[in-house]
Amino acid sequence: MSLLKEFKEFAMRGNVMDLAVAVVMGVAFNKIVTALVDGIIMPCVGLLLGGVNIAGLSFTVGDAQIKWGNFLQNVIDFIIVAFAIFILIKLINLLQRKKANEPEPVTPEVQLLTEIRDLLARNSSKI
């Protein structure tokens, strides 16, 4: 089998395609969370702290500038993304459990046999 054909089979498997879609969606979701943190959450936190720009907070030690405000902003980004993924996984697990607990749908054959059984039972009780 040629290398190109093997790669095509690998790339077209369901898991690889699902992973690719998940990565693209994750990147897009990260941009949304970053915009939320940078544009809404951190300015509100800054207002609560007296109008401070959190991202710009830093201190200097010698020649090194420690930008702890930017670090704090990225930690908040991470917490929001991690919490959203946690909630999503909980929701998926809940839906999978519900689906597993659903009874198998009755096939037309089984339904017909059940009706015949019920009719026979009613007729035998009349005799």
UniProtKB/Swiss-Prot annotation:
Homopentamer. HAMAP family: MscL. PROSITE patterns: MSCL (PS01327). It holds the Pfam family MscL. This is Large-conductance mechanosensitive channel. Belongs to the MscL family. InterPro entries: Mechanosensitive_channel_CS (IPR019823), MS_channel (IPR001185), MSC/AndL (IPR037673), MscL_channel (IPR036019). GO terms for molecular function: mechanosensitive monoatomic ion channel activity. GO terms for cellular component: plasma membrane. It comes from Legionella pneumophila (strain Lens).
